[in-house]
Amino acid sequence: MSDIPSDLHYTAEHEWIRRSGDDTVRVGITDYAQSALGDVVFVQLPVIGTAVTAGETFGEVESTKSVSDLYAPISGKVSAVNSDLDGTPQLVNSDPYGAGWLLDIQVDSSDVAALESALTTLLDAEAYRGTLTE
């Protein structure tokens, strides 16, 4: 069974979301996703400052098996990207919930309520587990 930490939020697209500040979330792909992808060889992420829209693609993960799109779980602005993935994309495989994180998204600080609302629409660990067919 895949590792599914209970303190994170999830999407049906196999991404995890962790609140990392008052107006910021960190995003990565789940253990299930990295396992299904196989060995990750390249991660394409947007540049810092790029606006992302919930439900729309913001990048892709390329593995030895396939290329998969990445979808923004919330709308906001990219405030950080994991530059370690440029030289070591396999961090997505070895530590998907830690060193293999993808990016941080910051919402408008005057609209933190929108972040709270967006987080409530995401899956909790139990609901995400229910979407998996292993």
Curated annotation (Swiss-Prot):
NCBIfam families (alphabetical): gcvH, PRK01202.1
Cofactor note: Binds 1 lipoyl cofactor covalently.
Entry-annotated residues carrying N6-lipoyllysine: 65
Entry keywords, A to Z: Lipoyl
Signal peptide region: none
HAMAP family for the chain: GcvH
Family per similarity comment: Belongs to the GcvH family.
InterPro entries with a match to the protein in the record: 2-oxoA_DH_lipoyl-BS, Biotin_lipoyl, GCV_H, GCV_H/Fam206, GCV_H_sub, Single_hybrid_motif
Entry cofactors: (R)-lipoate
Gene3D superfamilies the UniProt entry points to: 2.40.50.100
GO biological process terms held by the UniProt record: glycine decarboxylation via glycine cleavage system
The protein's assembly and partners: The glycine cleavage system is composed of four proteins: P, T, L and H.
The organism's place on the tree of life at top rank: Bacteria
Keyword presence, Repressor: no
Lipoyl-binding domain boundaries: 24-106
Cited function: The glycine cleavage system catalyzes the degradation of glycine. The H protein shuttles the methylamine group of glycine from the P protein to the T protein.
Assigned GO CC terms: cytosol; glycine cleavage complex
UniProt gene name: gcvH
Protein's recorded name: Glycine cleavage system H protein
Species whose genome carries this gene: Mycobacterium bovis (strain ATCC BAA-935 / AF2122/97)
